[in-house]
């Protein structure tokens, strides 16, 4: 199965800009599925999937800041 790039975006959180790529995939039954690839860093990705790009955009807008802030907190706690 092949993914088709349908959209690219970038989310700004604090001083970071996180690139996001949205893909479309056809299932074996012919239905469309969408995925978002969130690139947090080299070798550090989050992949989400849903039935629509709109839902993925909403989930991404909530998940990316939460992920970045939780990792910042974990680093601060580990350093202390």
Residue ranges of model-derived segments:
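Extended rod-forming repeat segments used as scaffolds/tethers
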Residues: 16, 31, 57-58
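Intrinsic disorder/low-complexity segments
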Residues: 11, 23-25, 51-53
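A short, structured beta-strand/loop element
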Residues: 19-48
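Mixed-charge, Lys/Arg-enriched low-complexity segments
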Residues: 42-80
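Negatively charged, low-complexity tracts enriched in Asp/Glu with abundant Ser/Thr
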Residues: 1-20, 79-80
